Amino acid sequence: MKIAVLSRNPRLYSTRRLVEAGIERGHEMVVIDTLRAYMNIASHKPQIHYRGKPLEGFDAVIPRIGASVTFYGCAVLRQFEMMGVFPLNESVAIARSRDKLRSLQLLSRRGIGLPVTGFAHSPDDIPDLIQMVNGAPLVIKVLEGTQGIGVVLCETATAAESVIEAFMGLKQDIMVQEYIKEAGGADIRCFVVGDKVIASMKRQAKPGEFRSNLHRGGSASLIKITPEERMTALRAAKVMGLSVAGVDILRSNHGPLVMEVNSSPGLEGIEVTTSKDVAGMIIGYLEKNSGPHMTRTKGKG
């Protein structure tokens, strides 16, 4: 197969591994800098050009679209879909999962376990918003943040009020969530490919920190997940419409709670921790499932 990898940086671990895994299995792998591709939208034959030439003959496309380029990245991916190229994850699913609020609303509607969550812009009764999520301690998040940036733990209601007021002054939409103390600063990253959790790891925040993101100095270790956690991860990925996803779960006193569903999960942490060939499994999924015009939205955007 001829497989495109949409990635701003061919040297990133995840991009490198996907290219290696594809070549090992005999495929032609082409890395395309998402922002440098440009499109002919309104022609009878949709096209993408890159470095002055049309991109043609691709069987599949692997989107590795960073959060900051979601809008343009999804547009390029959608154009591939219009051309009948099979996407590892569809543009609509990526856009859906990048909107944290929409994700939680969809997961909640399907009855998937979530921390109690409030959402506000300029609340006229801040103490009521704080009570809505069972009071302090609580976590406040800016909607656009990634890798644990824009996430604040407030130990008291007074601190929470100050932080909410500060974000209001910045005209930011904010998410207020109950703090799951029993998780002890740890979460579980379940790596979903197709209808299986192919690998999972526990991420533990460094001492004095509550954010377990590896980018924030958290450490990763092997973990055996429960059948309920496995089911939760698979259902969450399915609700988002993602074929490949990193589902972040907290262990709480009332079962597994989904924190986030990541449409472009990093491979380094999970491969190094579990010694599994995750990149190879992703290519294997494409081998089994890809075909022209096989998107669930049938390439109609």
UniProtKB/Swiss-Prot annotation:
GO terms for biological process: protein modification process; SOS response; translation. SUPFAM superfamilies: Glutathione synthetase ATP-binding domain-like (SSF56059). Binds 2 magnesium or manganese ions per subunit. ATP binds at K141, E178, Y179, D187, R211, S212, N213. It is an enzyme of class 6 (ligase). The keyword Repeat does not apply. Mn(2+) 1 binds at D248, E260. GO terms for molecular function: ATP binding; metal ion binding; ribosomal S6-glutamic acid ligase activity. InterPro entries: ATP-grasp, ATP-grasp_RimK-type, ATP_grasp_subdomain_1, RimK, Rimk_N, Rp_bS6_RimK/Lys_biosynth_LsyX. Keywords: ATP-binding, Ligase, Magnesium, Manganese, Metal-binding, Nucleotide-binding, Protein biosynthesis. Mg(2+) 1 binds at D248, E260. Its cofactor is Mg(2+); Mn(2+). Belongs to the RimK family. NCBIfam families: PRK10446.1 (NF007764), rimK_fam (TIGR00768). This is Probable alpha-L-glutamate ligase. It comes from Pseudomonas syringae pv. syringae (strain B728a).
